[in-house]
């Protein structure tokens, strides 16, 4: 490949009439020699407001060094982030999922607006990963995602703790099982430094999924944020994206149907977040890959849950790194026929070739259970259907002993009202707490319910009270919870007409989610109900008017997909 071929976009600056453009670029340090090399963007979601992202500006500098050492010209950019753990339980949570698509759009705008030939995207918090990947898939130029790494566990009285420990501490305090001082000690020790939340929560789930897809370097997702391996991974990403340019390797070569099947497989085996369904659907949509909720159930039925990771297990993601990391898990699954080993990745090698360089899981380790004795015989993410969710709903059942829950609904139109009911002991064992009008359009922004779910678990009701919503759950959530109910209430889905006292059934064996309300009664309620208007101001107003159903990934450009799958 010639240098001009590698400069498939930046060569636009070569002509005489682009002299003014080059004048601006010279002010940034470029010389005649630099104009002969590819321009590679390095874009991160660096921000000082959260440990997930506070270190990413320095990581951007490392990626630049990698790009430069490979003979290209690096240019660093920045985009936004919304910290879920800080926004949780506040009006700011409506901006979390919204930020995924803002990140995607801003990366595409910055990289396309400056005609870069390739780029490295660096992210840390939950929506950074899918936002970056949507942009990568839409642009289809050589690109690599590099994860900022997982946070180290906090330690209190010799025990590992994390952010979810604090959320659950609120429920224990309300139940009288913890003092305010106990909660304060959790608060002050849960987050010891930089990195994404430390269990198999959404950030680590999506970083893992991207590595499995083949769009991050092998090992990237499980390297702790403060490790030497992580720094090397970031710099290597800069070198690797230049190699992608040399090979003419594009995301569309990597993001195949088989890649998404493998990403779902590893997500099931590790017990990943429910948000993986939403984000993988959105990334697949951007990549023109046909993927649906039904695919998750198909894979769920054949892939066992192996990882004893938080939130339902006892280990954090750093523990997985110490016994071999995601590559060792993939190697184990590949050897047992669960993965497609012959597909290409961002290294230019196949999955099998990449994994050949890694060791097996450490003998005697306890983080990953053997296939012959799994934590659960099938996957923990289940797609439910029924007259309460005709287009589907997502349940995470890892650690849940109850197979079937039938109980009366207690219906709330906001999380705040539901939280108040929990705090005042209005929620009793057997209840089905329903929070609606918090979907993609209704929220707007489909906020997560970690504050609410953690309070229920903290009060000892995690297996005794079901929690249903057309909103989302944090990857840190566990218990009897069902989210992403579609159609959402704002779209006139059946959940909009559910009433307190109606009997609701959730069954993980039959994959049922239903309400004991006849079609005749449902039609009567529809006639009696006026749905609220869509939010209409600012970015949330824009989002509410264009976002798709959660069953389609809550994407903001669904209108332009024709039957052939072409955009």
Swiss-Prot record:
The record's free-text note on cofactor binding: Binds 1 [2Fe-2S] cluster per subunit. This cluster acts as a Lewis acid cofactor.
EC number, UniProt record: 4.2.1.9
Pathway: Amino-acid biosynthesis; L-isoleucine biosynthesis; L-isoleucine from 2-oxobutanoate: step 3/4; Amino-acid biosynthesis; L-valine biosynthesis; L-valine from pyruvate: step 3/4
InterPro entries referenced in this protein's UniProt entry, alphabetically: DHAD_IlvD/Edd, Dihydro-acid_dehy_C, DihydroxyA_deHydtase, DiOHA_6PGluconate_deHydtase_CS, ILV_EDD_C, ILV_EDD_N, IlvD/EDD_N
Active site: residue positions: 474 (proton acceptor)
Chain positions with N6-carboxylysine modification: 127
Source domain of life: Bacteria
Keywords for this protein: 2Fe-2S, Amino-acid biosynthesis, Branched-chain amino acid biosynthesis, Iron, Iron-sulfur, Lyase, Magnesium, Metal-binding
Amino-acid biosynthesis recorded as keyword: yes
Gene3D superfamilies: IlvD/EDD C-terminal domain-like
Residues binding [2Fe-2S] cluster: 52, 125, 197
Reactions it catalyzes: (2R)-2,3-dihydroxy-3-methylbutanoate = 3-methyl-2-oxobutanoate + H2O; (2R,3R)-2,3-dihydroxy-3-methylpentanoate = (S)-3-methyl-2-oxopentanoate + H2O
Positions that bind Mg(2+): 84, 126-127, 448
Cofactor(s) this protein requires: [2Fe-2S] cluster; Mg(2+)
GO molecular function: 2 iron, 2 sulfur cluster binding; dihydroxy-acid dehydratase activity; magnesium ion binding
One GO term of the biological process aspect: isoleucine biosynthetic process
Top EC class of this enzyme: lyase
HAMAP family reported for this sequence: IlvD
Subunit structure: Homodimer.
Family: Belongs to the IlvD/Edd family.
Function: Functions in the biosynthesis of branched-chain amino acids. Catalyzes the dehydration of (2R,3R)-2,3-dihydroxy-3-methylpentanoate (2,3-dihydroxy-3-methylvalerate) into 2-oxo-3-methylpentanoate (2-oxo-3-methylvalerate) and of (2R)-2,3-dihydroxy-3-methylbutanoate (2,3-dihydroxyisovalerate) into 2-oxo-3-methylbutanoate (2-oxoisovalerate), the penultimate precursor to L-isoleucine and L-valine, respectively.
Protein name: Dihydroxy-acid dehydratase
Organism per entry: Streptococcus pneumoniae (strain P1031)
